[in-house]
Amino acid sequence: MAGNSQRRGAVRKAGTKKGPTVGSGGVRRRGLEGKGATPPAHQRPHHPAGKRAAKAARQAQGRHKKTDDTEIVLGRNPVLECLRAGVPATALYVALGADSDERLTESVQIAADKGIAILEVPRHDLDRIAANGMHQGIALQVPPYNYAHPDDLLAEAKSDAMPALLVALDNISDPRNLGAIVRSVAAFGGHGVLIPQRRSASVTAVAWRTSAGAAARTPVARATNLTRALKQWADAGLQVVGLDADGDTTVDQIDGAGPIVVVVGSEGKGLSRLVRENCDAVVSIPMAGPTESLNASVAAGVVLAEIARQRRSA
């Protein structure tokens, strides 16, 4: 009878009822606020692309310090000259947000066509690579310079329709001087530069930049023994003319119309004794003022300009 039933209803077992759901309290939602747009892959430190970019930047930072290791070419003109000349390269670094111009656009296009890795890196990474900060937002990683042999340099010069015009450097230790001389050799129709294998500046990133890319099209050879190489060139018919502040004659008195090699000594040490003894003539540059000597690269440019003038007049 209703209301008088003694039947017990279903009893829920203890501990089976779910309690209230505990939420995050909005912690995760609030943690996502204010983060902005998702950065590109190469800027995210844990993304594979970001790790590759960071590794490449670290490698580039250290490698430019070693003469015999990979070099870093800096600046838009030198980088473009290297790429145009087909200089082997392993990576092209472009600063994020770098102002674009025709040089940068062409550099990126050539690198892409050649399959060279193109990495966008923060500007401060390039600042670390370039101690002076003069990278213009672009850098090219290239393998060690491939030096020519002195015999090949002479053969290439003699195969040209113009008489051979070569420059040898003695006691030149500043890579900026080397780069500037390479640039002058290219400007005045020279065929190449010869340097000693030891105790001499080499074709580093600094020389590349100073040459404004001329090192890409002007061969540089290394000689184990500079004096012996000059003797061989003399036997091949080249006039060996040394350039020194204590020269026996002046530069305007030499005959630059024929095959010639100009040997440039350093501003401080000049020509070494053995090199000087193997020169057909040692010339100086006449100066009107009280200046005792010119920078080696400036002096080389003056002599090359005089030889070019004589050849135009011949």
Curated annotation (Swiss-Prot):
Q: Where is the composition biased (Basic residues)?
A: 43-65
Name the family the entry cites.
Belongs to the class IV-like SAM-binding methyltransferase superfamily. RNA methyltransferase TrmH family.
The GO cellular component terms are:
cytosol
NCBIfam families associated with the record: rRNA_methyl_3
Q: Which UniProt keywords apply?
A: Methyltransferase, S-adenosyl-L-methionine, Transferase
Superkingdom to which the source organism belongs: Bacteria
MF terms (GO), sorted A to Z = RNA binding; RNA methyltransferase activity
Cite the residue spans of the region called Disordered.
1-70
Q: Which residues bind S-adenosyl-L-methionine?
A: 265, 285, 294
Tell me which Gene Ontology terms the entry assigns under biological process: methylation; RNA processing
For this protein, the Enzyme Commission number is 2.1.1.-
* Record flagged with keyword S-adenosyl-L-methionine: yes
**Pfam families reported for this sequence:** SpoU_methylase, SpoU_sub_bind
- The disulfide bridges present are none
Q: Mind telling me what this protein is named?
A: Uncharacterized tRNA/rRNA methyltransferase Mvan_5337
- The answer to whether the entry has keyword Plastid is no
